Amino acid sequence: GSGVTFTVDQPPTTRVAPLDEYAEKVVRARRRGLVYPYELVSMVAGSGGSVQELDLDESGRLVPVERPYGENTAGLICGLVTTPTPLHPEGVSRVLLCGDPLRALGAVAEPECARVIAALDLAEEWGLPVEWFALSAGARISMDSGTENMDWVAKALKRIIEFTQAGHEINVVVAGINVGAQPYWNAEATMLMHTKGILVMTPDSAMVLTGKQSLDFSGGVSAEDNFGI
């Protein structure tokens, strides 16, 4: 799964087709050492499984959407995953959440927090667990938004606590750098005494409350990179 490989083949006789928009996003993610969320679909669903992408409707509920992969409008991708098993041939279903590293490194504001809340509402309504591949730079910081982003982060955090206290399950896979709000969400979802879910950290993942750039700009003591913090 790592290293450089190459093959020798006959030169092509036709023009090389340019990459489409989706392929460009996959390549951009790989250049950063990340996996584009839609590439996780086959792995998460498993052999014979299925994934239905979900997005918000006008009323704020998650509903199935039919669109090409990569056309998400927020930094969080939602879906419904079903995987058949020998014990459950009809399939085991769960609600899927994936942070999009190509949208401000998964920074969260109202669009992302609203999807977290809607996903937990859907999972509670259907009695399903949540699988969350977490990758996020924390609350969005920009010139056109302010503390309302933190208000939405707190609202999503409250919903996570209510969801787990009601006996429901969130399983978190830390799939990269998690900064600020996301580690708080991860902890509240999996680390309290009443929670049922697990927290899995991949080798190249990290959970930090403040990122390297923020510490540098504020005059604080940081490290060589976010993993060092």
What do these predicted ranges mean?
Residues 23, 30, 45-51, 55-58, ...:
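Structural signal for hydrophobic packing residues in well-ordered secondary-structure cores
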Residues 134-229:
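Conserved catalytic cores of soluble enzyme domains
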Residues 83-100, 114-144:
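A structural preference for short, pocket-lining loop segments at secondary-structure junctions
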Residues 1-94, 98-104:
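Intrinsically disordered, low-complexity segments enriched in small/flexible residues
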Residues 61-73, 105-108, 197-213:
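Short charge-dense sequence patches
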Residues 102-111, 143-149:
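Flexible beta-alpha connector loops of hexameric P-loop NTPases
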